[in-house]
UniProtKB/Swiss-Prot annotation:
Gene from which this protein is expressed: COL1A2
Name of this protein: Collagen alpha-2(I) chain
Low complexity composition-biased segments: 9-36, 44-81, 110-131
Region (Disordered): 1-291
A GO term from the CC aspect: collagen trimer
GO MF terms, alphabetically ordered: extracellular matrix structural constituent; metal ion binding
UniProt keyword annotations, A-Z: Calcium, Collagen, Disulfide bond, Extracellular matrix, Hydroxylation, Metal-binding, Repeat, Secreted
Amino acid sequence: GFPGEKGPSGEAGTAGPPGTPGPQGLLGAPGILGLPGSRGERGLPGVAGALGEPGPLGIAGPPGARGPPGAVGSPGVNGAPGEAGRDGNPGSDGPPGRDGQPGHKGERGYPGNAGPVGAAGAPGPQGSVGPTGKHGNRGEPGPAGSIGPVGAAGPRGPSGPQGIRGDKGEPGDKGPRGLPGIKGHNGLQGLPGLAGQHGDQGAPGAVGPAGPRGPAGPTGPAGKDGRSGHPGTVGPAGLRGSQGSQGPAGPPGPPGPPGPPGASGGGYDFGYDGDFYRADQPRSPPSLRPKDYEVDATLKSLNNQIETLLTPEGSRKNPARTCRDLRLSHPEWSSGYYWIDPNQGCTMDAIKVYCDFSTGETCIRAQPENISVKNWYKSSKAKKHVWLGETINGGTQFEYNVEGVTSKEMATQLAFMRLLANHASQNITYHCKNSIAYMDEETGNLNKAVILQGSNDVELVAEGNSRFTYTVLVDGCTKKTNEWGKTIIEYKTNKPSRLPFLDIAPLDIGGADQEFYVDVGPVCFK
């Protein structure tokens, strides 16, 4: 007979097996390594950024291993009858059917008109599973199945194009404390310590004959290093330097974790040979041209110069700006002599100073440190203050020069030290024989006290305005005993422009039995 009309659509089938995992996305090459920035303070955590746009579709990689079959989903709700599909291609001829029973031969009737389409019948009971049929033609795509489990990681794909530079990461956690360093050499002899408190005056002893001045004793052993002071407060952030030249590309980073399965993409011709991007083939090292060697050497030299600026060593070739900078860069170092360059110019005018890391001071020694013993001045005229640097012995001024640095260069460095400091201090020791330095025990006043001249021509006196008054730590020059004594004078100020001392003017001198000499202590800035 003639083929019947196409029947209504059947019920929706059960969910298909899970699809194969999508190809792995390409790993972007690491960004170009930037120059190290200046060390700033730890910032507050930023707000979470907005979700970025999805990246471009990666090149299709080889299919991953087939995942295990997912669990059978529950039957879906019956869908509405779909529209009649297009006529399918004729199927292949089936096997001949079995012979039926012979029917009664009827008379040939006339072809009848096509009847109306009947209503959809009720779904029949599910039949038993039939034998596996032959492979039919490819049907229309079915509905998307449920997402299967993540498949095993596929092989590493070829290197993708260079990615955009990522945001700066947050500073890492503080590393563990390093191992203690080896014991260093014995340090140089330290500066003279502060004198002790003035003791109670003893009973006057019998005046003995003045003995000859003994020879200088041997230098004692170096004292033990003091305890490290507390770390200083973090200084203000420095000015941002000019942008340096672009550094060389860093080495490839480690492979990232497998990405989520990508969407199935259509075929696309990229216009290049796939063998060029195979990651499992070793790359031959690039050949460097002569100019590449010159560029590489220049970049290494610039990197070394940047490292010396960030971490000064306190040497003549790599001086620090102040002792405080050296202390911040190397908190484990102990006090001693180091090279600094306060004006940050050419290192040829760097100066050698004593860095006291326990107090954070930068100390510069006077040259010379002492004025030798002598009957400096003889006069029978009226008593008055006489300046050592102007009148006595043709002028003997206090200098603060360092070997290899001119007086003009030293003056420039001292000017920068005053600008960088908030506090300054210095002491001077007046050795006397029958000369009053501070208080006259006979009269009980300070009329015979010495006067000191500061670096900005200010005169520092024993009494008066407290801003210009020095302090006496030890006063052993209060009366005439025909023996040597000493008076230690100290001046501290929050105006560094007033130091160092440039001159001293004693008053009680000029007699035949009067002698004195001076030890100028280091000036310390903080």
